[in-house]
Amino acid sequence: DKGGLKEEAVKLIKELGATNIIIVGGLNSVPASVVSQLPGLNVRRISGNDRYETSAKLVKEFGSSRHIVFTDGRKFADALSATPLAKKLNSPILLVNSLDKLPKNLAIYRDAYIIGGKNSVGLDIENRIKSVKGDKVYRIFGQDRESTSNQVAQVLKYNENILANGSSFADALSAVNLLNNGGKNLLLVKKNSI
């Protein structure tokens, strides 16, 4: 909310006993007033000039991983579909949309996963990743956002499914909290059908 945290959110943070808060995004995303709503807590902000730089900083913050997952930063659905895979692999998700957004240190990752079709993460990006990783690059995609999430689920082979509206990011983003222990698919569905 541009006006700051809602009262319920502040109350929940206190009830959870949180002592450290990380704000993700710049002042246009999360206003400075949020910090004043959280007195006595360690609050820090991770942000960049755009969503891609913020994503890159979060990947760095994530720490070491043997894997990395790439998704299109212009569309939320593929990033949401990638979340159960990233959880299983204990890997960060990096938002990309052009070659200049790729990390320079691709070689540190054992393998890379691209979630989404060639219209989401282009062949130029895939080829650049392959030039470093060789055959350790895997693309998972479907004809649309719902089938992409289904293809990720096919790879994971989990028995438990979380269904969320694939047309609106809010429900699916909230559902990511249910992935805390892994072992669940996040399936995006159309509003009027499964």
Locate predicted features:
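Extracellular glycan-binding segments that recognize GlcNAc-based cell-wall polysaccharides
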Residues: 1-194
